[in-house]
Amino acid sequence: MLASLHRTWGEWNIAAGWLLGGNMFEMARENHGYQVYTEHRYYGETVPYANFTTENLRFLNVDQALADLAYFIQAMKQQPRFADSPVILYGGSYAANMVLWFKQRYPHLVLGTVASSGPIKGQVDFTGYLETVHEAFLSEGGEQCIDVIRQGNTPMEKIGGYIAQTAGLTTCWDMRYEALINTYSQPRSNSRAWYFQTCTEYGFFQTAPRIGTVFDPLVWLTVDFYVDICKKAFSERFDEEFVYDAVERVNLAFGGLEPDVNNTINIHGDIDPWHYLGTKIAARRIVASWLQSQE
């Protein structure tokens, strides 16, 4: 039986090298399968417009991205050699979200999915990301590691203060807030496309965690900080209320941490910061695999 192992798109350019090795490659070879790697709309060469103005980004959304894959699978099925082939989708990170959501939206087109490190619940104020990074430092390096990082933060803050006092005496690199905004305002960049998706569907804003972590100096890393970028890079209408409503819509549409899917393997690691938005998926008809770091 021919199994089509489909590596699914994420917020990046596709590359043939991903089809030449790894566990999916081995599974495809063992089952005489055929691997296909598709590219997400608005990334790599899969772009409908020459530039990414806010108006031109209106077709960048999860619903149409899923429909792209549905159309592609149907087209492949028109070929006699693939007509009766079951389809398995594989994805990691954001692509893991997409394979789970595809299984939910188009169950008749895919037999099963393998989702690795997928943050399937959208969240605006995502303090859990940096909290998990702190716990990973603590778990892998102990208190000594934490102390080293904290000791490094203090002189860096002092240097930053000194530079601020002498900024008018010399020419510095353009590290202003406006320069950061410009990064997401470039008409053709994956950074702009992905940030648009976070503003309009997912959130994932990695905000400052609770007091007592190595990230205490990042108190400025707030929801307001990220939303301000949304407004300045795209549109003033992308305010905090808009972002929260947009993320809630996606969670409502796909079930958040409890998607209605079957024949799914969900994989997360305990020091993976994204597990915070995906580990509770161990529900009916879903196999959850929890990978613990080695002491």
Task: Report the location of each language-model feature.
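C-terminal subdomain of alpha/beta-hydrolase-fold enzymes, centered on the catalytic histidine
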Residues: 151-295
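Conserved beta-strand elements of beta-rich interaction domains across eukaryotes
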Residues: 11-13, 41-43, 94-95, 120-121, ...
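Alpha/beta-hydrolase fold nucleophile elbow
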Residues: 81-93, 98
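Short, structured coil segments at secondary-structure junctions
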Residues: 31, 106-109
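Active-site signature of alpha/beta-hydrolase-fold catalytic machinery across serine-
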Residues: 101-105
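Structural recognition of the beta-strand scaffold that forms the well-ordered cores
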Residues: 4-7, 34-38, 88-90, 112-115, ...
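N-terminal cap/lid subdomain of alpha/beta-hydrolase-fold enzymes
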Residues: 1-70, 74-79, 240-263, 273, ...
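A catalytic-pocket lid/entrance helix-loop region that shapes and gates access to the active site
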Residues: 108-153
